[in-house]
A protein has these predicted regions:
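ATP-driven catalytic headpiece of P-type ATPases
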Residues: 89, 299, 421-467, 497-578, ...
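Membrane-embedded alpha-helical bundles of multi-pass transporters
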Residues: 110-124, 152, 171, 403, ...
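Conserved ATP-binding TGD loop and adjacent catalytic N/P-domain core of P-type ATPases
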Residues: 17, 38, 503-505, 539, ...
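Conserved catalytic phosphorylation-site environment of P-type ATPases
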Residues: 230, 280, 339, 388-462, ...
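Flexible metal-binding regulatory segments at protein termini and peripheral loops
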Residues: 1-124, 223, 238-240, 320, ...
Length: 833
């Protein structure tokens, strides 16, 4: 089982490494991953071999505090805010004491006057420095208590380095002051009180800036948590009462009025309303909800009145699960961070050894003074920064997963985030992924003497009693065009063939070609067009009255508006795109042509999809699988990265590494783009961290002193250390500016993309006047609809003739733009002259 613990007392990457080592050493613990920024640890353990109490005890034995996250009632983010405010107060008072300390100790070097009583005696001058230094050390005593505690436990951390550096300066200065008081020193000795105080103050400045920056990395999680309402209205025993949102129980009836937030997942049992689901699905338009419809936590009832039965409450709501996924992802570790983790575990002992070795070498080999050697040792201790190494990866991952969630992409682990950027083959399921997963009417061809409106009226009327998906596609098309339907009698469905019924006393047949032949209907006049539709992967339905063919309709699972653009973006990024489907080859090839997929694997049984993915992996491909159905789950697990379309089934989403909440294929390309951006950021952070420590430590040790006479002052070293962590975190925060290059596009834009797939370079020069032949217009309402669509194009003036079935378009516009606009309006362009 996996359980989250809240860990206190960690200050750097070395701390998190020690905590992970302590918990991971217990028998029965499979993995322990610490999130330094959130102060949490996610442990995967066998409860039969080890208990949560033993895990807590192991962490506490290492000098840190630990509690089960379920036992911590206070909001972690509020605790972080309180800790930041406390650190700010500590910093302010440290600076208040540091300014006079710096003036007293260093002012005379700058020609600044000192009070007479300080210049009268060297001892008075030294004591005054001590007086202002001690409050700074007391204010920042945590560096010493934690640092030395961890040193004695043989798990030194960054606090240990600061404590050793400041203590060395303080101890040397105290000894020199005692010698001065005893008269053993003539003149003013070299003291390091200001260095000890400055080191603590500057490190606190850096930690404060770092904590502020780290707080911004969790803004996405905080924003999600803010979506949940604090209270709700519950109806119990017929009486309404306001209760805290966390007190809602499963089965409670929750009342949500206009403008109210829905606090839990549930099902509408009374009322109706328009619900804004954009925070969860990204859908910009409100969704109508009525009795029986599901609703999701954190969504807003924009209008109407809803009563819903709570089905998922507390930690089980959709919002809570999203937050949990984000926290788990930010707590996980990417493979790219392994080297940094290994170095962080031994970094502090190595630095302590380098500091001691440098001081001894300068003393015994270089023949330098004690003050020189002490300055070198302190500088090495305080310039080194394990935090820069430890923060290089997690801050980028946390910002990246948060940014992904803002765009409707839920990434479950850092490993998935890293792998998505390295994927070179994307396998797409067809139905519900590339296509809408719902048949729609695409074409209408009426026989001579029959209008399209008449054909559609007859077709929808006879299909209305049927529950078949193709029948529903026909009736929905008629309803969208506001065509009135007629009642039929003697309705009969013939499995595998079609339906027949009586309309206005005439027997109507509707179905496939075989069904028509069986009932003596001649479909030969339409055979050429029906074959063309079939080649495009469409299902052809014929309609006949009293043995005479009225016309035919084509129904198909239409391509999603952004599929072509998304696939084009994937191909531009160097990915090989494969369409994997159980559908027949003809239909699969037709869809592939529309969206620009070059490789199709069709007629694959559900149980064989995983084998197809495995075969691609054996070819050396890093494979991402995108699907939405239960039959896609094994393939999602087999793939290096599994992506589930958000509208899919629970089992598919559970099997996936990444969940696309908007059900948009464009988000596959966006996930890959974001992953690559995060990887770039991590590499930059790691380079800076390694470069800083690789250069800073030798310089502090004095390697430039023999040639250039350059020796780093401990105060400057402390400032550099503070800024190094801030630089890493600030660089990661740049990811907050990331925006997806590939966005969901309109149907018009998608149609234009499809038209251009065959020959992207074949763009026509715009002409001033064109005549467009349009199919599908049946009334003046259609005329107005088409004119509005065409006139919306920039610089275009269009006039539509219903009788001729044409539109005259004037203006500088390409054929592709005209086709896109007309098709988006729901009609078909047959030709442009």
């Amino acid at each position: 089982m996996k359980e989250k613990f809240v860990v206190t007392g960690m200050t750097c990457a070395a701390c998190s490494a020690h905590v992970e080592k302590a918990a991971g050493a217990l028998p029965g613990v499979d993995s322990a991953v610490v999130n330094l920024m959130l102060g949490t640890m996610l442990v995967d353990y066998d409860p039969e071999k080890v208990t949560a109490e033993q895990i807590i005890s192991a962490v506490e034995s290492g000098g840190y505090g630990a509690k089960r996250a379920s036992d911590v009632k206070q909001d972690v983010h509020k605790e972080q805010d309180a800790a930041l405010a406390k650190m700010r107060r500590r910093l302010v008072w440290s600076i208040v004491c540091l300014v006079p300390l710096f003036y007293i100790s260093m002012g005379h070097m700058m020609g600044l006057p000192l009070p007479g009583f300080l210049t009268a005696s060297h001892l008075t001058h030294a004591i005054s420095q001590l007086v202002f230094c001690v409050p700074i050390l007391i204010l920042n005593r945590s560096y010493f208590t934690v640092g030395f505690t961890q040193l004695f436990r043989r798990s030194p951390n960054m606090d240990t380095l600061v404590a050793l550096g400041a203590s060395a300066g303080l101890l040397y200065s105290l000894i020199e002051m005692v010698r001065l008081a005893a008269g053993q020193v003539s003149g003013m000795p070299e003291l390091y009180f200001e260095s000890a105080g400055m080191i603590c103050a500057l490190v606190t400045v850096g930690k404060y800036l770092e904590e502020r920056s780290k707080g911004k990395t969790t803004d996405a999680i905080s924003a999600l948590l803010a979506l949940a309402p604090d209270s709700a209205v519950v109806k119990r025993n017929g009486v309404e009462a306001t209760v805290a949102a966390e007190d809602i129980r499963k089965g409670d009836i929750v009342v949500v009025r206009q403008g109210g937030k829905i606090p839990v997942d549930g099902v509408v049992v009374s009322g109706s309303g328009s619900v804004d689901e954009s925070v969860i699905t990204g859908e910009s338009l409100p969704v109508e909800k009525a009795v029986g419809d599901p609703v999701t936590s954190a969504t807003v009832n924009q209008s109407g009145y809803l009563e819903l039965e709570a089905t998922r409450v507390g930690a089980d709501t959709t919002l809570s699960q999203i937050v949990k996924l984000m926290e788990e992802a930010s707590s996980s570790k990417a493979p790219i961070s392994r080297l940094a983790d290994k170095i962080s575990g031994v970094f502090v002992p190595v630095v302590m050894s380098i500091a001691l070795a440098a001081a001894l070498l300068w003393a015994f080999v270089g023949g330098q003074s004690v003050q020189f050697c002490l300055s070198v040792g302190i500088a090495v201790l305080v310039i080194s920064c394990p935090c820069a190494l430890g923060l290089a990866t997690p801050v980028a991952i946390m910002v990246g997963t948060g940014k992904a969630a803002e765009n409707g992409i839920l990434i479950k682990s850092a490993q998935s985030l890293e792998l998505m950027g390295r994927v070179n083959t994307v396998v797409l399921d067809k139905t519900g992924t590339v296509t809408e997963g719902k048949p729609r009417l695409t074409d209408c061809l009426a026989a001579e003497g029959v209008t399209q409106e008449e054909l559609l009226c007859v077709a929808a009327s006879v299909e209305q009693p049927s529950e078949h998906p193709l029948s529903r596609a026909v009736t929905e098309a008629a309803q969208e065009r506001h065509i009135p339907l007629c009642e039929v009698t003697d309705f009969t469905a013939v499995p595998g063939g079609g339906v027949h019924a009586v309309l206005h006393g005439q027997k109507i047949f509707a179905g496939n070609g075989t069904f028509m032949h069986q009932n003596g209907v001649d479909i030969a006049p339409f055979s050429a067009q029906s074959e063309a539709w079939a080649d495009d992967g469409k299902t052809v339905l014929y309609f006949a009255e009293a043995g005479k063919l009225l016309g035919m309709l084509a129904v198909a699972d239409t391509v999603k508006p952004d599929s072509a653009a998304a696939i084009a973006a994937l191909k531009r990024s160097g990915c090989r795109v494969v369409l994997l489907t159980g559908d027949n080859t003809q239909t699969a090839d037709a869809i592939a042509r529309q969206v620009g997929v070059d490789q199709v694997i069709a007629q694959v049984l559900p149980q064989d999809k995983a084998a197809c993915v495995e075969r691609l992996q054996k070819e050396g491909q890093l494979v991402a699988m995108v699907g939405d159905g239960i039959n896609d789950a094994p393939a999602l697990v087999q793939a290096d990265v599994g992506l589930a379309i958000g509208a899919g089934t629970d089992i598919t989403i559970e099997s996936a590494d990444i969940v696309l909440m908007k059900s948009s294929l464009a988000d596959v390309a966006s996930a890959a783009e974001l992953s690559r951006a995060v990887l770039r950021n991590i590499r930059q952070n790691l380079f800076w961290a390694f470069f800083y420590n690789s250069v800073g430590i030798p310089v502090a040790a004095g390697v430039l002193y023999p040639a250039l006479g350059l020796l780093l002052n401990p105060m400057i070293a402390a400032a550099c250390m503070s800024l190094s962590s801030v630089c890493v975190v600030s660089n990661a925060l740049r990811l907050r500016l990331w925006k997806p290059k590939t966005k969901p596009v309109s149907s018009a834009a998608n149609t234009a993309a499809i038209e251009n797939i065959a020959d992207n370079d074949n763009e026509e020069e715009p002409t001033m006047k064109k005549t467009v032949t349009i199919e599908g217009m049946m009334c003046n309402h259609c005329v107005a609809h088409v004119e509005k669509a065409l006139n919306a194009l920039p610089g275009v003036k269009a006039t539509v003739d219903l009788a001729a079935g044409t539109a005259v378009v004037e203006g500088a516009v390409t054929d592709e733009a005209i086709r896109a606009a007309v098709t988006d309006a729901g009609y078909t362009v047959k030709g442009i002259q």
